[in-house]
Amino acid sequence: MVSQDVEIINRLGLHARAAAQLGKLTTQFRSKVFLKKEGQSANAKTIMDVLMLAGTQGTQITIEATGEDEQEALDTTVKLVAARFNESE
């Protein structure tokens, strides 16, 4: 299991489009990928789970990956968050 803390930096936070991108990205990996915030846990491959976290701009989350390609899954997910979910702002 590997994990990393990140900050949601895009203006709209974890909204539907960002959650969909996250789900599309993480389903490419065999590893389980979870987002954790203040005791809540969300399967990153499930849009509704991600939306339930209500991650707004400035929210700190932990990305956690477990499985055979866990490091690649973590690194790629962190890059997506750092890239503001590829949204222009």
Labelled PLM ranges:
Residues 56-89:
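C-terminal structural segments of small proteins and small subunits
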Residues 1-10:
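Short amphipathic
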Residues 4, 33, 59-61:
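Conserved beta-strand core positions
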Residues 1, 30, 39, 84-85:
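A composition-driven signal for long, intrinsically disordered, charge-rich low-complexity tracts
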Residues 9-48, 52-57:
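Compact, glycine-rich, soluble single-domain proteins
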